[in-house]
């Protein structure tokens, strides 16, 4: 199994020197997040507002070659700030994770520590009122995790979130993403591709998501292909807060068998 944590880059736009003051309409709009599931959305945090999106707890399990691995992430927060009417900056960091492995002989090993830092910049390219939404999302991963949790390499890429609203409360999301990844031997870099299709249906304050996801890692030592089916449910008890729960089911041997999580997002 190969688990790759992607992180994100800031492309620094020109920002006015005065302090941003959110408008009443922006502050009253329902929260829009890049969770649950693996998809990103074209929406951005309103100018001058902060937003936090985080797993409360994530559990990952995988069986491969006679070895079972379980990983726990104790929160996985993303901090966002609205830079303008159509752009925001985002920082993601795993403050603590624990990996427990047991091989076929019954030997157990445990590894724990912090994760990598991901920095992202999102620029929405379309009007927020249209049925078609498009954004560009460059990112970079900063290697802050210890060996065994991260690969110790600077990596990055660019995602292009695409959202299409369909009558009846449906939303279709596409998520093409190009990645620049470190070679497994640490001697160079290569390309990767991530793609997904996500279909969501809103029921009042609840939204149900179904998603098919793939990652294609074109490492010179051998291409690593991952596929998963992801399902989740989000609930908005009020316009500035969201709770969610979800599961990702691996569809091939290179993908973790099961990932389960609960999360919360809030804006202020």
Question: How does the language model describe each region?
Answer:
Residues 1-7:
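Sec-dependent signal peptide recognition
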Residues 9-10, 135:
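Hydrophobic alpha-helical transmembrane segments of integral membrane proteins
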Residues 12-16:
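Sec/Tat signal peptide C-region and signal peptidase I cleavage site
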Residues 17-268:
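Transmembrane beta-barrel domains of Gram-negative outer membranes and organellar outer membranes
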